[in-house]
Amino acid sequence: MKKNLYKISENKLIASKTFKMVLEGDGIVEGEFVDIGIPGYFLRRPLSVCDWEEGRMTLVYKVVGEGTKVLSEMAVGVELEVLTGLGRGFDPEACRERALLVGGGLGVPPLLLLAKRLKAQGKQVTAVLGFNKADEIILAEEFRAVCDEVLISTVDGSVGVKGFVTDAIAAARPSFDYFYTCGPMVMMKVVCNTLEGPGEASLEERMGCGAGFCYGCSIQTKNGPRRVCKDGPVFKKEELIW
């Protein structure tokens, strides 16, 4: 974990109430998520990392309250205090040859970096991305540029398969030996209970400190209590109690 000031180099609307922010600066430590300090607010906002490279990271977030509204209005050049290098992420080594990535809504962005790592290891990657409707679709082209196959589902049927990610999976029946999922808890529960074989899920819980001190994001697992921010947010399928 490292705290530093990072400068906004991009902050733009990419879908309904959804923004892409790029931060640049020295000393960025890679992690599964970051904790951003917003001026005027005591609690930081945890945001998952969509992409990362030396001195530069990309975040995708949705305006859901006053804090993220303030964040969306920040101009290029503004500096933010950010904790980087947080969380235990996905394990690309767990996949032997064929990976299935299942994302829903704001659970889609962190899977993009995972897709790039899997492809760099020579593995086949199928991504199934679920959204409510067409104007909420994000990063579809970015996934198509990386993955072997990309399937889209929308609840209203405006794009791709009508229904949920599990409907798209049932229709396409992709081959995989390991799956990774991130999105709404109800979606991940169905995915983990439906898909056979091993996999991992990235959980989302309300966080206080984001560093494991306050235990505000503690969950019960088959291995006892675990902190989502410190021991996760990624957990093996077999660890989770739904």
Feature annotation, model-predicted:
Residues 42-49, 87-94, 229:
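Short, Lys/Arg- and Gly-enriched loop/turn segments at beta-strand edges
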